[in-house]
């Protein structure tokens, strides 16, 4: 993940888009822009899926990753995001049922099993 975050950091530097030293420096305008960019790419993904366009799907997913990595930088999480992701994965795996099988809702959403626990992200961030 760090390789790709560094690539986006290079882009930010080349295009004079400095990343804040503290996530609290991110303005409402800046985080709303990040949200709009992701929303645009989500819509492009949906459209590409509807047209069975694998190139468009790959492009939209790649652009989403690019925006996500940039957003990670904007919030100063580049040094902790892998640990955060691992903790979320650990929590997601705790959703299995007592029999070790997934518990699924009718629409395919995975439900929380009896052993589910929330990810402890505050521990990672020291918050």
Question: Can you annotate each of these PLM segments?
Answer:
Residues 1-127:
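Flexible "arm" and connector segments at domain edges
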């Amino acid at each position: 993940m760090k390789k790709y975050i560094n690539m986006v950091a290079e882009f930010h530097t080349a295009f004079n888009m400095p990343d804040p030293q503290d996530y609290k420096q991110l303005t409402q305008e800046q985080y709303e822009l990040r949200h709009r960019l992701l929303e645009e790419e989500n819509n492009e993904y949906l459209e590409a899926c509807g047209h069975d366009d694998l190139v468009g799907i790959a492009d939209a997913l790649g652009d989403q990753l690019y925006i996500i990595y940039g957003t990670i930088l904007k919030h100063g999480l580049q040094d902790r995001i892998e640990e955060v992701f691992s903790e979320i994965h650990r929590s997601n795996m705790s959703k299995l049922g007592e029999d070790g099988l997934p518990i699924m809702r009718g629409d395919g959403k995975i439900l929380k099993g009896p052993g589910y626990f929330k990810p402890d992200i505050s521990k990672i961030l020291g918050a």
